[in-house]
Every structure is written in C-alpha cells, then in structure tokens.
Amino acid sequence: MEILIVIFVILSLIGSISFLKPSKKMKALSVIRHIASKEGFKIGSTQILRKKFKSWTPQVAIYQIKNDSSFKDMHFVREGNALILYAPMSLKYDEQFPVVQEKILLLPNSVLEIIFFQSNIAIVWNEMQGHEELLKIKTAILNICN
C-alpha cells in the first residue's frame, strides 16, 4: 500500500512538471513576440480596442505601433484579397485617398484589419505566420507613414 502511494505521488509530480514545459506553439509565439517588441510593437489590447475591430477573434493578435504618419482615424477591413475602407467613408472623396489606398494595398494578406489612431496604428493579424511576415508588415506600415 505504501508503495502505491509513493508511486502515485511520483506520477503526480511528473505530470505537474510536464505541464510547466511550454509547447512548440508557445515557444514559436514567444520568439515572434520578442522580435515584435524589439521592432517597436506593443502586443495585446484592451477590451475597448478589441470591440473596435470587426474581425478580432482569440486566434488572432492585436499589435500596435507608433503612428508617425499624417493619417488619423482611418479603419480598413480585409474583404477577400483587399483591405477596404470601413470608416470614415468621407475619406473616399478626399483627393489623397488613392495614394492612401495604394499604400494600404501593399500590406501583406496576413493583416486582417488596420486602424489608424492619433497616437498609434493597430493591426489584427495571425501571429502564426512567423516573424518574417511581421517584418514585412512593419516595412509596409513604415511605407504608409512616409
């Protein structure tokens, strides 16, 4: 009987320790998030920000980066292969809109949604695309800001 108790305790400890080891997916996400923070991205969001996005689900992530552009208060949502202006609709009649739209279309397909705020740019994208995709996104965003 004592041997069974000892075996049970040892198996419980082994099981508990195995849960502490991160999975391959979690290791990959930690590498991507580390690179993102080095590149100037803020990862995560508030409940209020999540509600502003139309395509946010728990399977995708919200990343934010400083907005150095003159573009403020714009919201684009992916429909098919293109990012479509969601708000404000009055921007479509602005003479600068074709230039903005051309730059927005250069964003990779992994970007599901992008919102330009006064101080930052928030994007929804699938983190599992890898850090190379993140660097493409950053390059495209910097191209938009210039």
Describe the role of every protein-language-model region.
Residues 33, 101-104, 138-141:
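A generic alpha-helix structural signal
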Residues 53-133:
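Structured extramembrane domains adjacent to transmembrane segments
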Residues 133-146:
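Extracytoplasmic/periplasmic C-terminal soluble domains
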